[in-house]
Amino acid sequence: MAAVVLENGVLSRKLSDFGQETSYIEDNSNQNGAVSLIFSLKEEVGALAKVLRLFEENEINLTHIESRPSRLNKDEYEFFTYLDKRSKPVLGSIIKSLRNDIGATVHELSRDKEKNTVPWFPRTIQELDRFANQILSYGAELDADHPGFKDPVYRARRKQFADIAYNYRHGQPIPRVEYTEEERKTWGTVFRTLKALYKTHACYEHNHIFPLLEKYCGFREDNIPQLEDVSQFLQTCTGFRLRPVAGLLSSRDFLGGLAFRVFHCTQYIRHGSKPMYTPEPDICHELLGHVPLFSDRSFAQFSQEIGLASLGAPDEYIEKLATIYWFTVEFGLCKEGDSIKAYGAGLLSSFGELQYCLSDKPKLLPLELEKTACQEYTVTEFQPLYYVAESFNDAKEKVRTFAATIPRPFSVRYDPYTQRVEVLDNTQQLKILADSINSEVGILCHALQKIKS
């Protein structure tokens, strides 16, 4: 059961559009100052009567009501209501009763728009379709300083890749691409140069999985792997999957994908005139830098934790999470025995910076997310500063601790069986979670007994 509250205003869309149009619900004034309330109920006898009884007990006058089957859950109905403006003094207690007594999920989206407005976020993996094409730069268009800007053949090729991404929908196989001889040559140069460094510079997890990618996904100097093959491999390892994207997404949208273990991945390759340079993520960066680590369970969980922390977070915290992502998933270093190795994709896909980051030139600091989240960084040259994690598990716990500081009126968890994000803000949801944990603990205890016997 879910509910959305508006005070002194109406929704920016009617019930028929709820959750489908904008990232924020607007706070506009209506004529009588009524409080607008949207809630959803399981389709069962007496469900709505409980809510109406609650209104009656608190002397709340219901002036308007609409209903429709929920688009998010086929077993629920959604109700759009206007409450008389005199209900405002008891609105807080009503919300508390909806949560605790009836089991409602209540989102106070705009009681105070400046402080409490919660950005829209995807609740199902299918909803990633809504923003996957809202790229910020590049795609089929290139900036004037891009190596391929004056190359009409390259620009036409980029449009082909962009069209693939724009037409893709969740659940479809990723279209296969016949890469040109020049594209394979560019890949080969990057692949050969970087592979020579991995043994001495990359972390254990990267080096452990790389031979498996060569064996099962066609990672070779003379072959650019197909995203669909790599995505299938990832799903068998950690549940992560690839999704083609035409260019750079906003930080909020990109991190939101990680919450569902979806990595938005480019399919095009950098311009052949500069095989060791790219101003944007390309397939070399994605497959050589990111994919090996997404195949590791601990790192996959760490990445998903960053994504889950971003859901519904205020804009200033999205910026902090994006900075944490930059200094970990993109440019992170980790301890490995007495040595320090690279695990960030930006390092593992850059021949020059992979050598530089482990030299005596940059400054190395321990990973402390409160400080890391506020650290400025450069996107045009090698980083002057890198953060060193004790381990992926340690980094994961630090992300969880940091997520607890994000001011949002709920917690979230990902259900891998339904591929949905569950909002945990009422006792009913917590009971379901407790039952799930209890079941897992039971399996653990049973397995321990088997081992002891």
From Swiss-Prot:
InterPro entries on file: ACT-like_dom_sf, ACT_dom, ArAA_hydroxylase, ArAA_hydroxylase_Fe/CU_BS, ArAA_hydroxylase_sf, Aro-AA_hydroxylase_C_sf, Aromatic-AA_hydroxylase_C, Euk_PheOH_cat
Keyword Oxidoreductase included in the entry's annotation: yes
Keyword presence, Ligase: no
E.C. numbers: 1.14.16.1
Modified-residue entries (N-acetylalanine), positions: 2
Gene Ontology molecular function terms on file: iron ion binding; phenylalanine 4-monooxygenase activity
Pathway: Amino-acid degradation; L-phenylalanine degradation; acetoacetate and fumarate from L-phenylalanine: step 1/6
Activity control note: N-terminal region of PAH is thought to contain allosteric binding sites for phenylalanine and to constitute an 'inhibitory' domain that regulates the activity of a catalytic domain in the C-terminal portion of the molecule.
Catalytic function, reaction form: (6R)-L-erythro-5,6,7,8-tetrahydrobiopterin + L-phenylalanine + O2 = (4aS,6R)-4a-hydroxy-L-erythro-5,6,7,8-tetrahydrobiopterin + L-tyrosine
One example of a Gene Ontology biological process annotation: L-phenylalanine catabolic process
Cofactor: Fe(2+)
Record domain ACT: where: 36-114
Phosphoserine: residues bearing it: 16
Pfam families associated with the record: ACT (PF01842), Biopterin_H (PF00351)
Keyword annotations of the record: Acetylation, Allosteric enzyme, Disease variant, Iron, Metal-binding, Monooxygenase, Oxidoreductase, Phenylalanine catabolism, Phosphoprotein
Enzyme class, UniProt record, top EC level: oxidoreductase
Amino-acid positions noted as binding Fe cation in the UniProt annotation, renumbered to this chain: 285, 290, 330
Record NCBIfam families: Phe4hydrox_tetr (TIGR01268)
Family affiliation: Belongs to the biopterin-dependent aromatic amino acid hydroxylase family.
Function summary: Catalyzes the hydroxylation of L-phenylalanine to L-tyrosine.
Quaternary structure, from the entry: Homodimer and homotetramer.
Protein name per its UniProtKB record: Phenylalanine-4-hydroxylase
Species this protein is from: Mus musculus
Gene transcribed to yield this protein: Pah
